[in-house]
Amino acid sequence: MYQSLMTVRETQIAIKEVKTFFEDQLAKRLELFRVSAPLFVTKRSGLNDHLNGVERPIEFDMLHSGEELEIVHSLAKWKRFALHEYGYEAGEGLYTNMNAIRRDEELDATHSIYVDQWDWEKIVQKEWRTVDYLQKTVLTIYGIFKDLEDHLFEKYPFLGKYLPEEIVFVTSQELEDKYPELTPKDREHAIAKEHGAVFIIGIGDALRSGEKHDGRAADYDDWKLNGDILFWHPVLQSSFELSSMGIRVDSKSLDEQLTKTGEDFKREYDFHKGILEDVLPLTIGGGIGQSRMCMYFLRKAHIGEVQSSVWPDDLREACKKENIHLF
């Protein structure tokens, strides 16, 4: 039966250790400045992240003006707008401590309706919009993960060390070709188990089979220049997503992707106009799950062991039977 390696109190202390180390190194190595972030945005701005395009945001109106507002799902689009508003230049970027509510999240060991992540975004030049630049950025972030594991091992040697020296890059099409009989999720399990750490490139568009590896909203990532960082989780014995990131859409890729998804109505939103008219800067960015990170590096079996959220009674009871104690 599962046994946590730390008490609840020890876990809370270690969570701070994880977050403080990672935040400091992320800012230094990607040359990012911390900024304040909104909990909600106006509906008409189009700044909310609609994730896979089907999740419902929490909506409410403001008494003063009647303006319709939405609790953010993530800050994928807001960050790009902020870089423009704050006058950042190529090579400069920002990050923020993002908190969100995703009401339609399917709850399980790795998913909660409460989301906390480091959301970051950086301005790039046109010639940087390449797979090589994407991979270079992934390697920088992976280096932070490696150093974090080493740092924690010095303080908590019982946590062990599991990350391989190198992260492997593979495209979603190569995965389909390698494992044609498996579902996309099972392909992720297979490749993560084989290598320990992988970055899957190209998520959102249809593969040669006609199926997508996974859904992505049409209006933030360029589907050819994005991907997910996955580790093999030693406790769960499954693939484990730490980050979704990518080079963002330019006017050409946004035009193509909105057409593919049948979302031409979004062309009238301020944010989308800013991209289509080449007003907003070209960027790369992503989200790095804070609770996910703590769950992996502290060897936890459930995300509820590293964050406070709301869980159905039957799920809490099931966890108790497995010796999993949720916050």
UniProtKB/Swiss-Prot annotation:
Pathway: Amino-acid biosynthesis; L-asparagine biosynthesis; L-asparagine from L-aspartate (ammonia route): step 1/1
Database matches in PROSITE patterns: AA_TRNA_LIGASE_II (PS50862)
Highest taxon above the source species: Bacteria
Gene Ontology process terms (BP): L-asparagine biosynthetic process
Reactions catalysed according to its record: L-aspartate + NH4(+) + ATP = L-asparagine + AMP + diphosphate + H(+)
Pfam families: AsnA (PF03590)
UniProt KW Ligase keyword: yes
Enzyme category, top tier: ligase
Alphabetic keyword roster: Amino-acid biosynthesis, Asparagine biosynthesis, ATP-binding, Cytoplasm, Ligase, Nucleotide-binding
Localization in the cell: Cytoplasm
Listed GO MF terms: aspartate-ammonia ligase activity; ATP binding; catalytic activity, acting on a protein; transferase activity
Coiled-coil ranges (or none): none
GO CC aspect terms: cytosol
Gene3D superfamilies: Bira Bifunctional Protein, Domain 2
InterPro entries: aa-tRNA-synth_II, aa-tRNA-synth_II/BPL/LPL, AsnA
UniProt key word Magnesium: no
EC number per UniProt: 6.3.1.1
PANTHER family: ASPARTATE--AMMONIA LIGASE
Database matches in HAMAP family: AsnA
UniProt similarity note: Belongs to the class-II aminoacyl-tRNA synthetase family. AsnA subfamily.
Protein name: Aspartate--ammonia ligase
Taxonomic source organism: Bacillus cereus (strain ATCC 10987 / NRS 248)
